[in-house]
Regions:
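N-terminal carbohydrate-binding accessory modules
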Residues: 27-78, 91-92, 266
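Aromatic-rich peripheral "rim/lid" segments of glycoside hydrolase catalytic domains that contact
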Residues: 286-357
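Acidic/histidine-rich helix-loop elements
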Residues: 46-63, 83-94, 227-255
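Bacterial N-terminal signal peptides
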Residues: 9-22
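Active-site region of glycoside hydrolase catalytic domains
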Residues: 137-252, 257-281, 303-309
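The substrate-binding groove and active-site-proximal loops of carbohydrate-active enzymes
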Residues: 50-53, 86-98, 123-133, 159-169, ...
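An active-site-proximal structural segment forming one wall of the substrate-binding cleft
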Residues: 58, 66-75, 93-121, 126-155, ...
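N-terminal secretory signal peptides that target proteins for export/translocation
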Residues: 1-7
Length: 357
């Protein structure tokens, strides 16, 4: 799994000359953001809790899973990297992490998956925004330099779920600074910026992006109602003891529709594509209810023209069991468009390997 990680991401570099082109016009950049969003289509979050970042200890994610993800019908992977713990006192990132990230991107690209690099240190950032700001700027300066002229299909996501002690104004200021760092040597890179994480869909209206930078996709996450999606979650004192909460009534669906359409209205006003970067329901909920929920979210995102990424491939909320090498079939089938199940060789490959959970 770790063999060859230190070498450059060759497949990413083949078309690296694209990144060296002059900055595109605002209209062309907006077109690129929209095109990238369409190409991302459906995806899945990966590697958030995997030991790959620590050199392979307790690392259940295997190289062959990239092909299995593509064969199942997914078009991108959102790579969850909590990088701050791998930075030294000067905020220099451990070069071994860059080598491991190179390997992940190379495998994604080799399997026709768009890689989204998600800086995932939301806990630390929500608790200590000032320290977060320094680390985030340092991280993206190093990442932008490392991938300048390389891997043009890779997308940079600035930060997972900004919020907590961050104010919208503080986040807007940091976004401007990080974008300046990235644009210095990645003028054509598509970037994802999250709105402040909130259960209120109108919170997105507080996000302020540089009007001249149109190659940006805006991320939102959706887990409402939390009493359903997080019932039984042992890390939550609010929801750990909850059980038996259902989802799927017409009222349930209307609330989701109203929330997402409010976000979509902002998207159309601002001319910014939307990315549903996380959604899902924890395993304690009944499987049929989980399928109804995830299927409805994915279908609604497709109807609105949004790319989406299910949370997550393995560990909790799992779409795949690495201990048995089995997909959670009802969830995968619920996420995918029903009219495309048997229409591609990729789906045929997935179907030949499917097993019941």
């Amino acid at each position: 799994m770790l063999a060859g990680m230190a070498k450059p991401a060759v497949l990413c570099a083949v078309m690296g000359f694209v990144c060296a082109l002059p900055a595109a016009s605002p209209c062309a950049a907006q077109d690129k953001a929209a095109a990238t969003a369409r190409q991302m289509a459906g995806g899945v979050n990966i590697l958030g809790y995997d030991g790959i970042w620590d050199g392979g200890v307790d690392a259940p994610f295997k190289q062959r899973y990239f092909k299995m993800i593509r064969d199942a019908g997914f078009h991108h992977v959102r790579i969850n990297l909590s990088a701050f713990k791998y930075m030294d006192s000067r905020n220099d990132l451990d070069l071994r992490i860059l080598a491991r990230l190179d390997w992940v991107l190379e495998q994604a690209v080799a399997n026709d998956l768009i890689p989204v690099i998600d800086e995932h240190d939301y806990d630390q950032c929500q608790r200590n925004p000032d320290e977060c700001g320094m680390k985030l700027l340092a991280f993206w300066k190093q990442l932008a330099g490392h991938y300048a002229g390389r891997c043009p299909t890779a997308v940079f996501e600035l930060l997972n779920e900004p919020g907590g002690k961050m104010t919208a104004a503080w986040w807007n200021t940091l976004v401007q600074s990080v974008l300046q760092v990235i644009r210095a040597n990645n003028p054509a890179r598509t970037v994802i910026v999250a709105a402040i994480n909130s259960e209120d869909p109108l919170e997105i209206r507080k996000l302020e992006l540089p009007p001249q930078d149109r190659n940006i996709i805006v991320a939102v996450h959706y887990y409402k109602p939390m009493m359903f999606t997080h019932q039984g979650a042992p890390w939550s004192w609010r929801f750990a003891l909850l059980r038996g909460i259902d989802w799927g009534s017409e009222d349930d669906k209307s609330r989701v529709t109203n929330d997402l359409e409010a976000v979509d209205a902002w998207s159309k006003e601002q001319g910014r594509p939307i990315y549903l970067g996380e959604f899902g329901a924890y395993e304690a909920a009944a499987m049929d209810a989980r399928v109804r929920y995830t299927s409805f979210l994915a279908r609604t995102a497709r109807r609105l023209g949004w790319p989406w990424a299910y949370w997550q491939f393995d560990h909790d909320f799992a779409l795949f069991h690495t201990d048995t090498d089995q997909w959670v079939i009802p969830l995968v089938d619920g996420l995918m468009p029903h009219d495309t199940h048997a229409e591609t060789s990729e789906r045929a490959n997935y179907s030949s390997r499917r097993t019941t959970p």
